[in-house]
Amino acid sequence: MALNDFHVSEPYTLGIELEMQVINPPGYDLSQDSSTLIDAVKPQLTAGEIKHDITESMLEMATGVCRDIDQAAAQLSAMQHVILQAASEHHLGICGGGTHPFQKWQRQEVCDNERYQRTLENFGYLIQQATVFGQHVHVGCANGDDAIYLLHGLSHFVPHFIALSAASPYMQGADTRFACARLNIFSAFPDNGPMPWVSNWQEFTGLFRRLSYTTMIDSIKDLHWDIRPSPAFGTVEVRVMDTPLTLDHAINMAGLIQATAHWLLTERPFKPQEQDYLLYKFNRFQACRYGLESVLIDVYTGDRRRLADDTLRLLDNVTLSARKLGADSAIDALRLQVKKGGNEAQYMREFIADGGSLIGLVQKHCEIWAGQ
């Protein structure tokens, strides 16, 4: 299948997608009623989009094209209000978090959607297991070559994005010992992890053509890379974050990615090389396992750095870009998070250590999302 031409978009514009959990109180397991909720909400939207994701326990909120994080926050907040009102009327709950802590994948119903049914045919039970919840951030690019450079530049900071957003320590009723267990779900997919190496947009079109030979790839949406170009939107899409427990944290993560993109494309601090990726999966694994306490290994020198320290260095590097984009509040909030040494996975474990149950944890997450 031919690839769309890269749509020219205004650089550094934003789009945010949040995959939300639809919850069935009082047991607080995942519901299978997202279609009912989506049908109730759609007529009330004034901006953005609410749609299905893989299974009937998932709901995706997506902004339109936003110039800055304030506009994105306004759109998401309006959607949040409408969704919560409809959820209350249908006796459902809504929450964030990268995984539901005790749902059973065998119970998950794949949406009655041509694309998802085709994906179920291709991947079998792996699609039901992929009932996990992430945040995706799109950043606008002027052309395809800029998009490829930006993708490679952002790949340096995949561990940082994972650790800051980690919110999936529990799965199938057990503590996984990971800060972010969600990304492990995709390890069996043939396109998991980083995009295969290309150096420019022309090479990318050739890569996509070859991937389409598999008959499993009909569009860019069928590729599960950590970061991927989206030519129809004219963006680069970062896909490694867990869905946060709060809208504020989702906005902060989007602000960081927007500011990092601006810094990368204006300063060009890296000359991308295929060798950059030799330790990519090791560093990614470390971030998933240990969060901000993990250790990064420099592929060229062998130097070892605490991810928390390297994250503070990234925040310092992008501060000026954030100020120009109106995203400095996001950088300030994330800097404070790193200095306090925590993420939402750590909070979840503390809740359980203090005597809470997994059912109580999901109930608490619904209350947090509802602002209670």
From Swiss-Prot:
Q: What GO molecular function annotation could you give as one example from this UniProt entry?
A: glutamate-cysteine ligase activity
Query: What keyword terms does UniProt attach to this protein?
Result: ATP-binding, Ligase, Nucleotide-binding
> Which EC class, in a word?
ligase
Q: Give EC number(s), comma-separated.
A: 6.3.2.2
- Which Pfam family is one of those matched by this entry? GCS2
Gene Ontology biological process: modified amino acid biosynthetic process
- Its domain of life reads Bacteria
User: What InterPro entries would the database entry show?
Assistant: GCL_type2/YbdK_subfam, GCS2, Gln_synth/guanido_kin_cat_dom, YbdK
Q: Please state the span of the N-terminal signal peptide per the UniProt entry.
A: none
Q: Which reaction does it catalyse?
A: L-cysteine + L-glutamate + ATP = gamma-L-glutamyl-L-cysteine + ADP + phosphate + H(+)
Q: What NCBIfam families does this protein's entry cite?
A: gshA_cyan_rel, PRK13516.1
Similarity annotation: Belongs to the glutamate--cysteine ligase type 2 family. YbdK subfamily.
The UniProt function text for this chain reads: ATP-dependent carboxylate-amine ligase which exhibits weak glutamate--cysteine ligase activity.
Q: How does it assemble?
A: Homodimer.
Q: What is this protein called?
A: Putative glutamate--cysteine ligase 2
Naturally occurring in which organism (per UniProt): Salmonella paratyphi A (strain AKU_12601)
Provide the taxonomic classification: Bacteria, Pseudomonadati, Pseudomonadota, Gammaproteobacteria, Enterobacterales
